[in-house]
Amino acid sequence: MIHQINKKILYISFFLMIILVTVHFTYYLSQIPSTTNQNNTFINTDGIVVLTGDKNRISEGINILKKNSNQRLLISGVNKKISNSAIKSLYANDTETRQLFNCCIDFDKISTNTFENSREAYFWARDRQLKTLLIVTSNYHIPRVKLEFSRFFQKDSLYYKSVKVAKNDKSDISIEMIRKIIFEYIKYLRTSLSFLVKI
């Protein structure tokens, strides 16, 4: 009898957990911004932080910087094995970008994850007395980025620019994109839990 009750409790607990995870996953998906019709009026922040990872993030950050060279750009999470000159060489035929590298672009080679990105961005902004930042990253990454950056920054000091990954934004459902979203959700879930318990 006791065994049957325990088994029933186990089934109910498992079922409730599935419901909770499903609801939370749906919430995560709802937090992924569209990359179309974005409001770009906030590009005049004091600084721009590009989180390395998917393609187009760095080029998007540089394009924003070109619109206002009074800003400063941090490329965060650069592989330690990649030299600054190697990155600059990618823009060898772009005179304007080469000039920006000489005056307005910094590299962070310490960060290896999103938490460290947020921490190093905080140190960078503090040292350069930057009050507002535009964070540039892939759209599916933004929900977790908001959580991690909230550890160091006030909400009203941060703005976000989501970079398109899939060809047709959310409507382009590919195996690779589904895999990325699932793995990113697992990280998002872990980060969410870390605000409740120390992990």
Feature annotation, model-predicted:
Residues L10-Y27:
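Hydrophobic membrane-insertion alpha-helices, especially the h-region
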